[in-house]
């Protein structure tokens, strides 16, 4: 027995092409507006423990502009990635 395929073009909608994201180059990016430098934070500051993290948060909040945040309890597990 053979198969017979009949295609109805009127019933099949053409699939929309995915939109390509516009490529951004450096000339499209302007200078920051309303920028306020509040703190220096390095990877060593975060790995020294939770006391350091809370002191960094307190320092940044004392500079202003962080009043709209919400408090959250966070537990972090530190993993040493040094090759030994």
Swiss-Prot record:
UniProt entry keywords in alphabetical sequence: Cell membrane, Cell projection, Cell shape, Cytoplasm, Cytoskeleton, Lipoprotein, Membrane, Palmitate, Phagocytosis, Phosphoprotein
Gene Ontology MF terms in the entry: signaling adaptor activity; small GTPase binding
Record GO biological process: phagocytosis; regulation of cell shape; regulation of Rho protein signal transduction
InterPro entries: CRIB_dom (IPR000095), CRIB_dom_sf (IPR036936), SPEC (IPR039056)
Lipidation (S-palmitoyl cysteine): 10-11
Bilayer topology term: Lipid-anchor
Described purpose of this protein according to its UniProt entry: Probably involved in the organization of the actin cytoskeleton by acting downstream of CDC42, inducing actin filament assembly. Alters CDC42-induced cell shape changes. In activated T-cells, may play a role in CDC42-mediated F-actin accumulation at the immunological synapse. May play a role in early contractile events in phagocytosis in macrophages.
Domain comment in the entry: The CRIB domain mediates interaction with CDC42.
Family named by the database record: Belongs to the CDC42SE/SPEC family.
Protein name as it appears in the record: CDC42 small effector protein 2
Organism: Bos taurus (Bovine)
